[in-house]
């Protein structure tokens, strides 16, 4: 079964969102179990980004906050913040072309967030790429 990178990114977003909700609820979990629940194939891409975002979350938030005017990432809706974190991680720590990471983030934001969040994600990612 072949799954596109776009589909995998959507799964990554779902996994990271689920982890975020579990953390807020103080629910115990294993990252590997959440990955397995959401995707039935082995994917280094998924594991790399999920684990990387978890490991570097504070750094990713600081990076985003540096470009959010009169906002912090904590004020975004949970899905918007998740999309932003995973996209910043992909831009900074993977060999994915930056334009691809931005476009994929925008597509996820169009589907799952409102117009204001989409614009904010686009602006932050653009600033990161051009710093």
Predicted stretch roles:
Residues 1-131:
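N-terminal interaction/assembly modules
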